[in-house]
Amino acid sequence: MALAGCPDSFLHHPYYQDKVEQTPRSQQDPAGPGLPAQSDRLANHQEDDVDLEALVNDMNASLESLYSACSMQSDTVPLLQNGQHARSQPRASGPPRSIQPQVSPRQRVQRSQPVHILAVRRLQEEDQQFRTSSLPAIPNPFPELCGPGSPPVLTPGSLPPSQAAAKQDVKVFSEDGTSKVVEILADMTARDLCQLLVYKSHCVDDNSWTLVEHHPHLGLERCLEDHELVVQVESTMASESKFLFRKNYAKYEFFKNPMNFFPEQMVTWCQQSNGSQTQLLQNFLNSSSCPEIQGFLHVKELGKKSWKKLYVCLRRSGLYCSTKGTSKEPRHLQLLADLEDSNIFSLIAGRKQYNAPTDHGLCIKPNKVRNETKELRLLCAEDEQTRTCWMTAFRLLKYGMLLYQNYRIPQQRKALLSPFSTPVRSVSENSLVAMDFSGQTGRVIENPAEAQSAALEEGHAWRKRSTRMNILGSQSPLHPSTLSTVIHRTQHWFHGRISREESHRIIKQQGLVDGLFLLRDSQSNPKAFVLTLCHHQKIKNFQILPCEDDGQTFFSLDDGNTKFSDLIQLVDFYQLNKGVLPCKLKHHCIRVAL
């Protein structure tokens, strides 16, 4: 029977040897292996009358002395992890002895006594120093549970490096030049970062905010896809590059209005000879189909400043140009760029930096390129609609169904949250009714004639109130500072004194969708304003002129036929009514300070 917790070397301790030598042979247990002594005791009946109480007291004293000896030698005697005991003397190799050494009953009792846990742990720590070569090593199947240096509870320091949550600081700029440093995780996507910035900036989350990868030294920029990892994209950017926080209403416009994007002559299918525009979306999202976008583009030669107009074909395998007219035979197609390890960008100032023939340039940039312009594949379209078509086709062919999932995720979240949250009431012509609050309780005016007269009366009352406010707010007759002439400056859609080119640039950056607008000061008339509006991917400007009626200044878009006391009323009206405009005002350009 092995001693649980106490090595056999305790038997060689002087204190223990003294106790063993002082013990008389007549007090040994009859169950011991010493048979001659047992037979002598049975023969002599006089020796059976042993004082039992004295024997028990002697055994208890021996146990107490042995326990103190274990405590004294626990720091020096090793205990192997495999359950075997380290001997003070190495065991001699050879055949096993036929005669086993006699074990006294007192030793058998002492071997069943426990030792302190701390002493055993200290003995285990010194195992490697006292392990002998004659004892075979038994591997421990659970070293992390019983090892002295590995606690059973996982701590952040005990996690492997791959599982540790890495954090990184990312600097994001706004359109007005302000910036914010945000600490993000390594697995944070562009959508997650946009939602975080929306929360920190107290903006309205309408799923149109995007993160823009901006390269000023290359004159390139693009909107990150919602599923892209921000840290991974930043690793491919140069030191001059930066992230911009911007609106983009046209990011998923293709899924809303696919009919308005691709002309019929630009779309072909390899597997079917004819197909309608309604099948366009399914063919782009289906990985087994092979849609193609074809047409003429201006292509800049690598390493040269010259541009050539070539017939270009975009497939899932890459972008090709034809070396012989409009032929698409394999021997006439030359690979221009690969879609797998590249991204498509818009040219910011293509005419000035790359001598582009038009202002509608695009670029296919390999991910490995940082500052060099030699490997950039620069292209140029004839108009903005053609450029949008090529860039949208590139994204669809590269990402496919993943792009559609990015479009559907916000809608699915909105549908799940709608039963638990009160929806914001949309302002439209179908959600407004005429009310009469002249009595003690309000009532709905159902008669159209009565509703029209009530609206006219309310309009006259509003004009009278605004006139009184103008009179009270005027500082001097020469420099009137009325509320109606300055209240619009508090709105996000008013951008102040910017040029026509700047307003067009802002409209293009935030998406050429129908109804996107902004208001600005007129450069030709100091008292007038300009409404810049996008319709059918074209930008138009409408002048807002002031007019006077009964000494009161009004603003009008249609030469005084429809008058408004301030620009806020004008914008509210044309958000509900098209009027003289080609479409209603739907989205306004906004700049947010981070």
Swiss-Prot record:
Ras-associating domain segment(s): 166-250
Highest taxon, organism lineage: Eukaryota
Expression across tissues: Widely expressed in fetal and adult tissues, including fetal and postnatal liver, lung, kidney, skeletal muscle, heart, spleen, skin and brain.
Family matches, as InterPro entries: BPS-dom (IPR015042), GRB/APBB1IP (IPR039664), Grb10_SH2 (IPR035037), PH-like_dom_sf (IPR011993), PH_APBB1IP (IPR039665), PH_domain (IPR001849), RA_dom (IPR000159), SH2 (IPR000980)
Post-translational modification comment from the UniProt entry: Phosphorylated on serine residues upon EGF, FGF and PDGF stimulation. Phosphorylated at Tyr-67 by TEC.
Modified residues (Phosphoserine): S104, S150, S418, S428, S431, S476
Full protein name: Growth factor receptor-bound protein 10
Organism (species): Homo sapiens (Human)
Gene behind this protein: GRB10
